[in-house]
């Protein structure tokens, strides 16, 4: 059994500048400052005793052919990794999984890719996970989103992330123990019950 744990994130500045149309057209590109939270998306991948695919999330699906899955992120992650039969996949979130503004869909995608690659015996870099998640969400599924969520989920930590026509650059921000302590004491995340 493979278990993946992927963080969600908050942004301190630069939201919207990670969208390709902005980042590639501005002379300096886009930039966000992102902080991975201690809230996660958990993904498990386990071998089944038959060739069916079973996916458990807020719903449950069991199919003979992965192409018949309604969960498009799971379906496309399976297609990209080549793990297409004989598996049981479960996703569990520490937070509501849609509309929170914390990048949870991208964390699901990164977590799925990480778990499926490892299930297939491959270790991939954080950069590859982020790029593959972008390919699924933006290129294949046509989501009108930027790239910060995938990179924040794949790299974790506190980062300055730059986006431009030539790609993405991640710069980890080194925070003092005092600053980390203060952030933990002063930042409060509240679920209002509303989705965006």
Regions found by a protein language model. Give the residues of each.
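Generic N-terminal targeting/processing segments that precede catalytic cores or assembly contacts
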Residues: 1-63
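ATP-dependent small-molecule kinase catalytic core of the GHMP/sugar-kinase superfamily
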Residues: 2-4, 9, 16-22, 27-30, ...
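Short linear Ser/Thr-Pro motifs
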Residues: 11, 104-106, 146
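Short clusters of hydrophobic/aromatic residues that line enzyme substrate/ligand-binding pockets
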Residues: 33, 102, 161
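Anion-binding (especially nucleotide phosphate/pyrophosphate-binding) glycine-rich loop
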Residues: 38-136
